[in-house]
Amino acid sequence: MEMVRLSKLMFTFCIAVLIPTIRGNISELDEYWSQRADEAREFTLQAYHSDPYEIVDHFHERHYDNSTDVTTPEEDGDAKPEEEEKEFIEMLGSSTNSTRRSLRGKGKGKWSKLKGPCTASNPIDKCWRCRSDWAKRRKKLTRCVRGFGHRTTGGKRGRIYVVTSNLDEDMVNPKPGTLRHAVIQKEPLWIIFKNDMSIRLNQELLINSHKTIDARGANVHVAHGAGITMQFVKNVIIHGLHIHHISESSGGMIRDSVDHFGMRTRADGDGLSIYGSSNIWLDHISMSKCQDGLIDAIVGSTGITISNSHFTHHNDVMLLGAQNTNEADKHMQVTVAYNHFGKGLVQRMPRIRWGFVHVVNNDYTHWELYAIGGSQGPTILSHGNRFIAPPHKPHYREVTKRDYASEDEWKHWNWRSDKDVFMNGAYFRQSGNPQYKCAHTRQQMIKPKNGLAVSKLTKYAGALDCRVGRRC
Protein backbone atom coordinates (compact mmCIF):
# COMPACT_ATOMS: atom_id res chain seq x y z
CA MET A 1 0.00 0.00 0.00
CA GLU A 2 2.84 2.39 0.87
CA MET A 3 4.49 1.66 -2.50
CA VAL A 4 1.23 2.44 -4.30
CA ARG A 5 0.90 5.74 -2.39
CA LEU A 6 4.50 6.62 -3.18
CA SER A 7 3.97 5.81 -6.86
CA LYS A 8 0.91 8.04 -7.06
CA LEU A 9 2.72 10.83 -5.18
CA MET A 10 5.63 10.73 -7.62
CA PHE A 11 3.23 10.70 -10.55
CA THR A 12 1.38 13.73 -9.15
CA PHE A 13 4.69 15.56 -8.85
CA CYS A 14 5.66 14.73 -12.45
CA ILE A 15 2.35 15.95 -13.82
CA ALA A 16 2.42 19.10 -11.68
CA VAL A 17 5.87 20.00 -12.98
CA LEU A 18 5.08 19.13 -16.56
CA ILE A 19 1.73 20.74 -17.30
CA PRO A 20 2.71 24.39 -16.70
CA THR A 21 5.75 24.03 -18.97
CA ILE A 22 4.30 22.17 -21.95
CA ARG A 23 1.47 23.86 -23.81
CA GLY A 24 0.93 21.74 -26.89
CA ASN A 25 -0.49 24.06 -29.54
CA ILE A 26 -1.86 26.56 -27.02
CA SER A 27 -0.47 30.01 -27.80
CA GLU A 28 -1.17 31.35 -24.31
CA LEU A 29 -1.91 29.20 -21.27
CA ASP A 30 -4.72 31.42 -19.96
CA GLU A 31 -6.82 30.81 -16.84
CA TYR A 32 -9.19 28.56 -18.77
CA TRP A 33 -6.45 26.26 -20.08
CA SER A 34 -4.69 26.28 -16.71
CA GLN A 35 -7.87 24.99 -15.12
CA ARG A 36 -8.26 22.38 -17.85
CA ALA A 37 -4.69 21.24 -17.24
CA ASP A 38 -5.31 20.94 -13.49
CA GLU A 39 -8.46 18.93 -14.13
CA ALA A 40 -6.59 16.71 -16.59
CA ARG A 41 -4.03 15.94 -13.89
CA GLU A 42 -6.80 14.72 -11.59
CA PHE A 43 -8.44 12.71 -14.39
CA THR A 44 -5.12 11.06 -15.17
CA LEU A 45 -4.61 10.06 -11.55
CA GLN A 46 -8.09 8.55 -11.50
CA ALA A 47 -7.52 6.63 -14.73
CA TYR A 48 -4.10 5.30 -13.71
CA HIS A 49 -4.02 1.71 -12.42
CA SER A 50 -1.34 0.99 -9.82
CA ASP A 51 -1.55 -2.69 -10.83
CA PRO A 52 -1.59 -2.72 -14.66
CA TYR A 53 -1.45 -6.52 -14.74
CA GLU A 54 -4.97 -6.54 -13.34
CA ILE A 55 -6.12 -4.72 -16.49
CA VAL A 56 -4.23 -7.16 -18.70
CA ASP A 57 -6.34 -9.81 -16.99
CA HIS A 58 -9.47 -7.71 -17.46
CA PHE A 59 -8.86 -7.49 -21.19
CA HIS A 60 -9.26 -11.24 -21.50
CA GLU A 61 -12.19 -11.50 -19.11
CA ARG A 62 -15.53 -12.56 -20.60
CA HIS A 63 -18.39 -10.44 -19.37
CA TYR A 64 -21.54 -12.40 -18.65
CA ASP A 65 -24.23 -10.05 -17.40
CA ASN A 66 -27.76 -11.16 -16.61
CA SER A 67 -29.24 -7.67 -16.91
CA THR A 68 -31.82 -7.27 -19.66
CA ASP A 69 -29.92 -4.68 -21.69
CA VAL A 70 -26.72 -6.65 -22.17
CA THR A 71 -26.05 -9.02 -25.03
CA THR A 72 -25.91 -12.59 -23.74
CA PRO A 73 -23.27 -15.11 -24.84
CA GLU A 74 -25.89 -16.84 -26.96
CA GLU A 75 -26.86 -13.57 -28.66
CA ASP A 76 -23.37 -12.37 -29.48
CA GLY A 77 -21.97 -15.73 -30.49
CA ASP A 78 -19.44 -15.91 -27.64
CA ALA A 79 -18.03 -19.40 -27.28
CA LYS A 80 -18.41 -21.33 -24.07
CA PRO A 81 -15.10 -22.30 -22.42
CA GLU A 82 -15.36 -25.94 -23.49
CA GLU A 83 -15.85 -24.82 -27.11
CA GLU A 84 -12.75 -22.61 -27.25
CA GLU A 85 -10.39 -25.31 -28.50
CA LYS A 86 -12.80 -26.25 -31.31
CA GLU A 87 -13.28 -22.56 -32.19
CA PHE A 88 -9.52 -22.01 -32.33
CA ILE A 89 -8.99 -24.99 -34.64
CA GLU A 90 -11.71 -23.70 -36.96
CA MET A 91 -10.07 -20.27 -37.02
CA LEU A 92 -6.87 -21.87 -38.30
CA GLY A 93 -8.68 -23.55 -41.16
CA SER A 94 -8.14 -21.03 -43.94
CA SER A 95 -4.81 -19.63 -45.15
CA THR A 96 -3.27 -18.59 -41.84
CA ASN A 97 0.07 -18.09 -43.59
CA SER A 98 -1.32 -15.70 -46.15
CA THR A 99 -0.46 -12.01 -45.89
CA ARG A 100 -3.22 -10.95 -48.25
CA ARG A 101 -6.44 -9.41 -46.96
CA SER A 102 -9.71 -10.03 -48.77
CA LEU A 103 -11.38 -6.64 -48.48
CA ARG A 104 -13.92 -7.34 -51.24
CA GLY A 105 -13.82 -3.94 -52.79
CA LYS A 106 -13.30 -0.48 -51.37
CA GLY A 107 -15.20 2.23 -49.63
CA LYS A 108 -18.94 2.18 -49.38
CA GLY A 109 -19.54 -1.44 -50.24
CA LYS A 110 -16.52 -2.84 -48.48
CA TRP A 111 -18.34 -5.66 -46.70
CA SER A 112 -21.53 -5.81 -48.75
CA LYS A 113 -20.46 -8.94 -50.64
CA LEU A 114 -19.91 -11.01 -47.52
CA LYS A 115 -22.31 -13.93 -47.40
CA GLY A 116 -23.41 -16.29 -44.67
CA PRO A 117 -23.72 -15.66 -40.94
CA CYS A 118 -21.98 -12.82 -39.12
CA THR A 119 -18.49 -13.93 -38.16
CA ALA A 120 -17.31 -11.46 -35.53
CA SER A 121 -14.32 -13.29 -34.14
CA ASN A 122 -12.83 -11.17 -31.37
CA PRO A 123 -14.42 -10.32 -28.01
CA ILE A 124 -14.99 -6.63 -28.73
CA ASP A 125 -16.79 -7.26 -32.03
CA LYS A 126 -18.76 -10.20 -30.65
CA CYS A 127 -20.28 -7.82 -28.14
CA TRP A 128 -22.18 -5.81 -30.80
CA ARG A 129 -21.46 -6.50 -34.46
CA CYS A 130 -23.75 -9.44 -35.08
CA ARG A 131 -26.92 -7.63 -34.04
CA SER A 132 -29.07 -6.21 -36.82
CA ASP A 133 -30.59 -3.72 -34.36
CA TRP A 134 -27.29 -2.07 -33.43
CA ALA A 135 -28.59 1.33 -34.60
CA LYS A 136 -31.33 1.18 -31.96
CA ARG A 137 -28.77 0.22 -29.35
CA ARG A 138 -25.85 2.47 -30.26
CA LYS A 139 -24.86 3.26 -26.70
CA LYS A 140 -24.50 -0.44 -25.85
CA LEU A 141 -21.16 -0.11 -27.65
CA THR A 142 -19.74 1.23 -24.38
CA ARG A 143 -20.13 -2.22 -22.82
CA CYS A 144 -17.71 -3.68 -25.35
CA VAL A 145 -14.48 -1.81 -24.61
CA ARG A 146 -11.65 -3.77 -23.02
CA GLY A 147 -8.16 -3.12 -21.81
CA PHE A 148 -6.89 0.09 -20.24
CA GLY A 149 -9.68 2.12 -21.82
CA HIS A 150 -12.34 -0.06 -20.20
CA ARG A 151 -13.81 2.80 -18.16
CA THR A 152 -14.55 4.88 -21.25
CA THR A 153 -18.24 5.66 -21.84
CA GLY A 154 -17.99 8.69 -24.13
CA GLY A 155 -21.35 10.36 -24.64
CA LYS A 156 -23.40 7.51 -23.18
CA ARG A 157 -25.18 9.78 -20.71
CA GLY A 158 -26.01 12.41 -23.32
CA ARG A 159 -28.38 12.92 -26.20
CA ILE A 160 -27.86 11.95 -29.84
CA TYR A 161 -26.40 14.74 -31.99
CA VAL A 162 -26.76 14.30 -35.76
CA VAL A 163 -24.10 15.87 -37.99
CA THR A 164 -25.86 17.06 -41.13
CA SER A 165 -23.14 19.15 -42.82
CA ASN A 166 -19.56 18.43 -43.85
CA LEU A 167 -18.61 22.12 -43.79
CA ASP A 168 -15.89 23.53 -41.54
CA GLU A 169 -15.87 27.23 -42.32
CA ASP A 170 -15.96 29.13 -39.03
CA MET A 171 -13.43 28.15 -36.37
CA VAL A 172 -14.80 30.47 -33.69
CA ASN A 173 -18.55 30.22 -34.30
CA PRO A 174 -19.14 26.86 -35.98
CA LYS A 175 -22.57 26.28 -37.45
CA PRO A 176 -25.00 23.90 -35.75
CA GLY A 177 -25.07 20.58 -37.56
CA THR A 178 -21.32 20.52 -38.20
CA LEU A 179 -18.89 18.17 -36.51
CA ARG A 180 -16.98 21.10 -35.00
CA HIS A 181 -20.15 22.46 -33.41
CA ALA A 182 -20.90 19.03 -31.94
CA VAL A 183 -17.53 18.32 -30.33
CA ILE A 184 -17.17 21.69 -28.53
CA GLN A 185 -20.36 21.27 -26.50
CA LYS A 186 -19.83 20.89 -22.76
CA GLU A 187 -22.54 18.28 -22.27
CA PRO A 188 -22.10 14.57 -23.05
CA LEU A 189 -23.08 13.83 -26.67
CA TRP A 190 -23.34 10.73 -28.85
CA ILE A 191 -22.48 12.13 -32.29
CA ILE A 192 -23.69 10.35 -35.43
CA PHE A 193 -23.91 11.31 -39.12
CA LYS A 194 -27.00 11.81 -41.27
CA ASN A 195 -25.33 10.53 -44.43
CA ASP A 196 -21.99 9.74 -46.06
CA MET A 197 -19.62 12.70 -46.05
CA SER A 198 -16.02 13.82 -46.40
CA ILE A 199 -14.97 16.50 -43.92
CA ARG A 200 -11.99 18.74 -44.64
CA LEU A 201 -10.96 20.42 -41.40
CA ASN A 202 -9.49 23.88 -41.89
CA GLN A 203 -7.85 23.78 -38.44
CA GLU A 204 -7.38 21.06 -35.83
CA LEU A 205 -10.64 19.77 -34.38
CA LEU A 206 -10.62 20.15 -30.58
CA ILE A 207 -12.84 17.57 -28.88
CA ASN A 208 -14.37 18.27 -25.47
CA SER A 209 -14.86 15.63 -22.78
CA HIS A 210 -17.64 13.02 -22.73
CA LYS A 211 -18.07 12.64 -26.48
CA THR A 212 -18.62 9.70 -28.80
CA ILE A 213 -18.04 10.14 -32.52
CA ASP A 214 -19.91 7.16 -33.98
CA ALA A 215 -19.70 6.88 -37.78
CA ARG A 216 -21.64 3.62 -38.01
CA GLY A 217 -24.37 3.90 -40.63
CA ALA A 218 -22.41 6.31 -42.82
CA ASN A 219 -19.15 6.38 -44.75
CA VAL A 220 -17.33 9.30 -43.08
CA HIS A 221 -13.88 10.54 -44.05
CA VAL A 222 -11.84 13.19 -42.24
CA ALA A 223 -9.32 13.95 -44.95
CA HIS A 224 -7.20 16.48 -46.86
CA GLY A 225 -7.07 18.95 -43.98
CA ALA A 226 -6.20 19.21 -40.30
CA GLY A 227 -6.42 16.41 -37.74
CA ILE A 228 -8.28 15.68 -34.52
CA THR A 229 -7.00 16.69 -31.07
CA MET A 230 -7.98 15.60 -27.57
CA GLN A 231 -6.18 17.94 -25.16
CA PHE A 232 -6.72 17.91 -21.40
CA VAL A 233 -9.99 16.00 -21.76
CA LYS A 234 -11.41 12.67 -20.63
CA ASN A 235 -13.87 10.03 -21.73
CA VAL A 236 -13.86 10.10 -25.54
CA ILE A 237 -14.81 7.34 -28.02
CA ILE A 238 -14.02 7.59 -31.74
CA HIS A 239 -15.47 4.79 -33.83
CA GLY A 240 -15.70 4.05 -37.53
CA LEU A 241 -13.92 7.01 -39.14
CA HIS A 242 -11.63 7.03 -42.17
CA ILE A 243 -8.78 9.45 -41.38
CA HIS A 244 -6.22 10.12 -44.10
CA HIS A 245 -4.18 12.76 -45.95
CA ILE A 246 -3.94 14.93 -42.84
CA SER A 247 -1.59 17.91 -43.13
CA GLU A 248 -0.20 20.54 -40.78
CA SER A 249 -2.38 23.55 -40.07
CA SER A 250 -1.30 27.11 -39.43
CA GLY A 251 -3.23 27.73 -36.23
CA GLY A 252 -5.24 30.78 -35.29
CA MET A 253 -8.32 31.55 -33.24
CA ILE A 254 -10.16 28.27 -32.61
CA ARG A 255 -13.09 27.52 -30.32
CA ASP A 256 -12.60 24.52 -28.04
CA SER A 257 -15.74 24.96 -25.91
CA VAL A 258 -19.00 26.86 -26.05
CA ASP A 259 -17.57 29.33 -23.54
CA HIS A 260 -13.95 29.58 -24.68
CA PHE A 261 -11.82 30.15 -27.75
CA GLY A 262 -8.20 31.13 -28.06
CA MET A 263 -5.10 31.33 -30.21
CA ARG A 264 -3.61 28.02 -31.34
CA THR A 265 -0.16 27.59 -32.83
CA ARG A 266 0.75 25.38 -35.78
CA ALA A 267 -0.42 21.74 -35.61
CA ASP A 268 2.03 19.14 -36.91
CA GLY A 269 -0.37 17.06 -38.97
CA ASP A 270 -1.12 14.12 -36.67
CA GLY A 271 -4.24 12.16 -37.53
CA LEU A 272 -5.28 11.73 -33.90
CA SER A 273 -3.47 13.57 -31.12
CA ILE A 274 -4.11 12.59 -27.49
CA TYR A 275 -2.50 15.12 -25.16
CA GLY A 276 -2.79 14.97 -21.37
CA SER A 277 -6.05 13.04 -21.71
CA SER A 278 -7.50 9.90 -20.16
CA ASN A 279 -10.09 7.21 -20.81
CA ILE A 280 -9.93 7.16 -24.60
CA TRP A 281 -11.17 4.38 -26.91
CA LEU A 282 -10.31 4.35 -30.62
CA ASP A 283 -12.07 1.51 -32.46
CA HIS A 284 -12.56 0.44 -36.10
CA ILE A 285 -10.66 3.38 -37.57
CA SER A 286 -8.91 3.32 -40.96
CA MET A 287 -5.85 5.58 -41.06
CA SER A 288 -3.17 6.42 -43.61
CA LYS A 289 -0.99 9.17 -45.08
CA CYS A 290 -0.80 11.80 -42.35
CA GLN A 291 1.96 14.39 -42.40
CA ASP A 292 3.31 13.57 -38.93
CA GLY A 293 2.01 10.59 -36.94
CA LEU A 294 -1.17 8.59 -37.34
CA ILE A 295 -1.76 8.47 -33.57
CA ASP A 296 0.18 10.30 -30.84
CA ALA A 297 -0.57 9.83 -27.13
CA ILE A 298 1.66 12.04 -25.00
CA VAL A 299 2.03 14.20 -21.87
CA GLY A 300 0.65 11.83 -19.26
CA SER A 301 -2.20 10.43 -21.33
CA THR A 302 -3.46 7.11 -19.95
CA GLY A 303 -6.38 4.69 -19.88
CA ILE A 304 -6.33 4.16 -23.66
CA THR A 305 -7.50 1.29 -25.86
CA ILE A 306 -6.72 1.25 -29.60
CA SER A 307 -8.56 -1.64 -31.24
CA ASN A 308 -9.85 -3.11 -34.50
CA SER A 309 -8.14 -0.45 -36.62
CA HIS A 310 -6.34 -0.66 -39.96
CA PHE A 311 -3.16 1.32 -40.58
CA THR A 312 -1.46 1.69 -43.99
CA HIS A 313 0.99 3.86 -45.98
CA HIS A 314 2.76 5.81 -43.28
CA ASN A 315 6.19 6.26 -41.69
CA ASP A 316 5.71 7.07 -37.99
CA VAL A 317 2.57 5.12 -37.14
CA MET A 318 1.93 5.34 -33.40
CA LEU A 319 3.87 7.32 -30.81
CA LEU A 320 3.17 6.67 -27.13
CA GLY A 321 5.22 9.18 -25.17
CA ALA A 322 7.10 11.90 -27.03
CA GLN A 323 10.03 12.99 -24.86
CA ASN A 324 12.77 11.12 -23.03
CA THR A 325 12.65 13.79 -20.31
CA ASN A 326 8.89 13.60 -19.79
CA GLU A 327 8.42 11.37 -16.77
CA ALA A 328 4.70 12.10 -16.73
CA ASP A 329 4.45 9.36 -19.36
CA LYS A 330 5.90 6.86 -16.90
CA HIS A 331 2.38 5.86 -15.90
CA MET A 332 0.88 5.89 -19.37
CA GLN A 333 -1.12 2.68 -19.89
CA VAL A 334 -2.30 1.63 -23.36
CA THR A 335 -3.87 -1.48 -24.88
CA VAL A 336 -3.23 -2.10 -28.60
CA ALA A 337 -5.46 -4.97 -29.75
CA TYR A 338 -6.92 -6.64 -32.86
CA ASN A 339 -5.37 -4.11 -35.25
CA HIS A 340 -3.93 -4.75 -38.70
CA PHE A 341 -0.65 -2.98 -39.41
CA GLY A 342 -0.67 -3.24 -43.18
CA LYS A 343 0.91 -2.03 -46.40
CA GLY A 344 3.39 0.81 -46.64
CA LEU A 345 4.23 1.14 -42.93
CA VAL A 346 7.78 1.86 -41.82
CA GLN A 347 8.10 2.03 -38.02
CA ARG A 348 6.52 2.85 -34.62
CA MET A 349 3.76 0.26 -34.29
CA PRO A 350 3.96 1.53 -31.56
CA ARG A 351 7.04 3.39 -30.30
CA ILE A 352 6.86 3.76 -26.50
CA ARG A 353 8.53 5.86 -23.82
CA TRP A 354 8.16 5.18 -20.10
CA GLY A 355 4.71 3.54 -20.09
CA PHE A 356 3.08 0.12 -19.89
CA VAL A 357 1.68 -1.18 -23.19
CA HIS A 358 -0.20 -4.42 -23.83
CA VAL A 359 0.10 -5.40 -27.50
CA VAL A 360 -2.27 -8.31 -28.10
CA ASN A 361 -3.50 -10.25 -31.15
CA ASN A 362 -2.43 -7.73 -33.78
CA ASP A 363 -1.41 -8.62 -37.33
CA TYR A 364 1.89 -7.12 -38.51
CA THR A 365 2.06 -7.93 -42.20
CA HIS A 366 4.40 -5.14 -43.27
CA TRP A 367 7.16 -2.96 -41.85
CA GLU A 368 10.32 -1.43 -43.26
CA LEU A 369 12.53 -0.69 -40.22
CA TYR A 370 10.95 -2.26 -37.13
CA ALA A 371 7.53 -2.90 -35.58
CA ILE A 372 7.73 -2.18 -31.84
CA GLY A 373 10.27 0.20 -30.33
CA GLY A 374 10.94 2.19 -27.22
CA SER A 375 13.19 4.02 -24.82
CA GLN A 376 13.23 5.05 -21.17
CA GLY A 377 12.39 1.58 -19.89
CA PRO A 378 8.78 0.95 -20.93
CA THR A 379 7.08 -2.35 -20.13
CA ILE A 380 5.85 -4.10 -23.29
CA LEU A 381 3.80 -7.29 -23.23
CA SER A 382 3.45 -8.81 -26.70
CA HIS A 383 0.78 -11.52 -26.64
CA GLY A 384 -0.47 -13.57 -29.58
CA ASN A 385 0.61 -11.27 -32.41
CA ARG A 386 1.73 -12.31 -35.89
CA PHE A 387 4.92 -10.69 -37.18
CA ILE A 388 5.83 -11.09 -40.87
CA ALA A 389 9.25 -9.60 -41.59
CA PRO A 390 9.88 -7.72 -44.85
CA PRO A 391 11.13 -10.32 -47.35
CA HIS A 392 13.19 -7.79 -49.29
CA LYS A 393 15.06 -6.41 -46.23
CA PRO A 394 16.88 -9.21 -44.40
CA HIS A 395 18.61 -6.73 -42.07
CA TYR A 396 15.28 -5.50 -40.68
CA ARG A 397 13.74 -8.73 -39.48
CA GLU A 398 13.93 -7.85 -35.81
CA VAL A 399 10.51 -6.84 -34.48
CA THR A 400 11.95 -4.68 -31.70
CA LYS A 401 14.16 -1.59 -31.53
CA ARG A 402 15.59 0.00 -28.39
CA ASP A 403 16.88 3.58 -28.42
CA TYR A 404 19.03 5.80 -26.21
CA ALA A 405 20.31 2.96 -24.00
CA SER A 406 23.16 0.48 -23.91
CA GLU A 407 22.48 -3.24 -23.62
CA ASP A 408 23.54 -3.09 -19.98
CA GLU A 409 20.57 -0.80 -19.42
CA TRP A 410 17.88 -2.16 -21.74
CA LYS A 411 18.46 -5.78 -20.76
CA HIS A 412 16.52 -4.93 -17.60
CA TRP A 413 13.51 -3.56 -19.50
CA ASN A 414 10.59 -5.95 -19.33
CA TRP A 415 9.80 -6.70 -22.98
CA ARG A 416 8.14 -10.12 -23.12
CA SER A 417 6.69 -12.17 -25.94
CA ASP A 418 4.15 -14.98 -25.54
CA LYS A 419 2.11 -16.88 -28.13
CA ASP A 420 3.50 -14.65 -30.89
CA VAL A 421 4.04 -16.10 -34.37
CA PHE A 422 7.08 -15.11 -36.46
CA MET A 423 7.38 -15.46 -40.24
CA ASN A 424 10.02 -14.63 -42.88
CA GLY A 425 12.71 -14.77 -40.20
CA ALA A 426 11.09 -12.22 -37.88
CA TYR A 427 12.20 -12.34 -34.26
CA PHE A 428 11.41 -10.53 -31.00
CA ARG A 429 14.42 -9.74 -28.80
CA GLN A 430 13.13 -10.24 -25.27
CA SER A 431 14.57 -8.58 -22.19
CA GLY A 432 13.86 -8.39 -18.49
CA ASN A 433 13.07 -11.29 -16.20
CA PRO A 434 12.98 -14.53 -18.25
CA GLN A 435 10.81 -16.11 -15.54
CA TYR A 436 8.26 -13.33 -15.81
CA LYS A 437 4.66 -14.51 -15.74
CA CYS A 438 1.57 -12.34 -15.78
CA ALA A 439 -0.70 -13.25 -12.87
CA HIS A 440 -3.83 -14.83 -14.32
CA THR A 441 -6.84 -16.43 -12.67
CA ARG A 442 -9.52 -18.55 -14.34
CA GLN A 443 -12.12 -15.99 -13.27
CA GLN A 444 -10.26 -13.02 -14.75
CA MET A 445 -8.27 -14.30 -17.66
CA ILE A 446 -8.84 -15.89 -21.02
CA LYS A 447 -5.40 -16.33 -22.53
CA PRO A 448 -4.67 -14.53 -25.81
CA LYS A 449 -5.38 -16.52 -28.93
CA ASN A 450 -2.29 -17.94 -30.56
CA GLY A 451 -0.75 -15.64 -33.14
CA LEU A 452 -1.80 -18.08 -35.86
CA ALA A 453 -5.38 -16.89 -35.34
CA VAL A 454 -4.86 -13.17 -35.89
CA SER A 455 -5.83 -13.18 -39.57
CA LYS A 456 -9.32 -14.09 -38.38
CA LEU A 457 -9.30 -11.92 -35.26
CA THR A 458 -8.35 -8.85 -37.31
CA LYS A 459 -10.27 -9.72 -40.48
CA TYR A 460 -12.63 -6.76 -40.13
CA ALA A 461 -10.10 -4.23 -38.82
CA GLY A 462 -10.75 -0.69 -39.98
CA ALA A 463 -13.91 1.30 -40.61
CA LEU A 464 -16.89 -0.95 -41.36
CA ASP A 465 -19.73 -0.48 -43.81
CA CYS A 466 -22.52 -0.57 -41.24
CA ARG A 467 -26.01 0.00 -42.60
CA VAL A 468 -29.10 0.50 -40.45
CA GLY A 469 -31.15 -2.66 -40.12
CA ARG A 470 -28.28 -4.94 -41.12
CA ARG A 471 -25.48 -6.60 -39.25
CA CYS A 472 -22.15 -4.86 -39.62
Swiss-Prot record:
Needed co-factor(s): Ca(2+)
Glycosylated residues (UniProt): 25, 66, 97
Keywords assigned: Calcium, Glycoprotein, Lyase, Metal-binding, Signal
Catalysed reaction equations from the record: Eliminative cleavage of (1->4)-alpha-D-galacturonan to give oligosaccharides with 4-deoxy-alpha-D-galact-4-enuronosyl groups at their non-reducing ends
Cited SMART domains: Amb_all (SM00656)
UniProt xrefs under SUPFAM superfamilies: Pectin lyase-like (SSF51126)
Entry's cofactor comment: Binds 1 Ca(2+) ion. Required for its activity.
Signal peptide coordinates: 1-24
GO molecular function: metal ion binding; pectate lyase activity
Pathway, per record: Glycan metabolism; pectin degradation; 2-dehydro-3-deoxy-D-gluconate from pectin: step 2/5
Compositional bias ranges of the Acidic residues kind: 72-83
Chain positions recorded as Ca(2+) binding sites: 268, 292, 296
EC identifiers of the protein: 4.2.2.2
Enzyme's top EC category: lyase
Residues forming the catalytic site: 348
Family of this protein: Belongs to the polysaccharide lyase 1 family.
Protein known as: Probable pectate lyase 19
Lineage: Eukaryota, Viridiplantae, Streptophyta, Embryophyta, Tracheophyta
